[in-house]
Amino acid sequence: LSIRRQRQMCIRDRTMEQMNGLVAVNSLMAMVGGTLAAFLAGKNDPGYVHNGPLAGLVAVCAGSNVMHPLGALITGVVAGFIFVKAFALTQNKWKIDDVLGVWPLHGLCGVWGGLAAGIFGLKALGGMGGVSFMSQLIGTGLGVAIALTGGFLIYCLLYTSDAADE
């Protein structure tokens, strides 16, 4: 009982000023998870190993103030694997020219992070609470819809202006 209370005091009973430590620890845990996953899944490829920590950081941003550090580590691990697999798929199978891996790194890992905040932010999993998976799912879906709409409109604008120039 006392260990459980200590853990609750460490995480749940914090003021906003005290949250900075939790955010810093969660950021580091996600970086470690992303690095390890990219190292394992990317077979020690330097490009993957360098982007693994970024994948973890991008993913944990949505929930760094509500997750337990173990949840942040898991979020980073999953993001590292997502980045390696999606980057390889984009480059090798789909032949899409995304040399820096912006779409898998920021797009897919960001979507995972939005959903992970709704999972690992729950009090039942050691998080701070105040979030729900459904709210995160809806918010992430709306963010993706807005990004796709904006990207499509800009593509159409550039495509028609290129046709007029030729």
Q: Model-found features: residue ranges?
A:
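Single conserved hydrophobic/aromatic residue that forms the stacking wall/gate
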Residues: 1-7, 11, 159-166
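Helix-coil boundary and interhelical linker segments in multi-pass alpha-helical membrane proteins
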Residues: 12-18, 62-70
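The feature identifies polytopic integral membrane transport proteins across all domains of life
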Residues: 19-24, 49, 96-104
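Structural signature of hydrophobic alpha-helical transmembrane segments
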Residues: 19-30, 71-77
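Transmembrane alpha-helical segments of multi-pass membrane transport proteins and ion-pumping complexes
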Residues: 30-39, 43, 56-60, 64, ...
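Cytoplasmic-side transmembrane-helix entry/capping segments in multi-pass membrane proteins
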Residues: 47-54
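A cytosolic-side transmembrane-helix exit/cap motif
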Residues: 69-74, 90-100
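Structural signal for the N-terminal portions of transmembrane helices
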Residues: 127-145
